[in-house]
Structure formats: structure tokens, C-alpha cells
Amino acid sequence: MSTRNIHVNTASYTLLVAGKKKNTGEEWDVLEFSSLTELKKYRKSHPEKMAFSYSYALSRGVDTQFRHINIAEADHFKQFLRQIKRAGLDIRAIC
């Protein structure tokens, strides 16, 4: 009987979206999504507002101090998608 080592990529990702009203001292409201489809559905039902600032991040987990380890981050959604693609990740695989 032969044994072989099979490597399975079990990386899980978290999509984070932060938003706050521009030019205020308010804290960021942060939303977490487990899939790109889920994020797109949310954006469709809650379009961005001009009076707000947004930030998008793709996290592969947290470090020992519980800070997210971001692989991609941007202030604009299309720019965020390009960064994910540039990182060599298949966007469809982020589900």
C-alpha cells in the first residue's frame, strides 16, 4: 500500500468593508462578508454614498495580536477587485 502526501489549500478569506461619513470624527463601521457574491449583493442593495468614505480589505486571518493580515486593500471597489486579481487569487474561489 502506498501513501502520498496530498496538499489541500484550506486557506479561508474574510472580506471586510469599512465605511464612515467624511470629515467627521466618527469611528468606522465595519462589515464582514464570507464571499464575494455576498458582498456584491450587499453593495447592490446598499449603494455607496458620496458623503461617505469606504475601505475594502481581503484578510487571510489574524496575527498573534489579533490584527487582520490583509492581502489586498483599497478605498474603491474596482481597485480592490484588481488587487485581488494581481495577488494571483481566483476571485471566484473566494466563496
Swiss-Prot record:
Domain of life: Bacteria
Gene giving rise to this polypeptide: yubO
Lineage of source species: Bacteria, Pseudomonadati, Pseudomonadota, Gammaproteobacteria, Enterobacterales
Entry keyword set: Plasmid
Protein's name according to its UniProt entry: Uncharacterized protein YubO
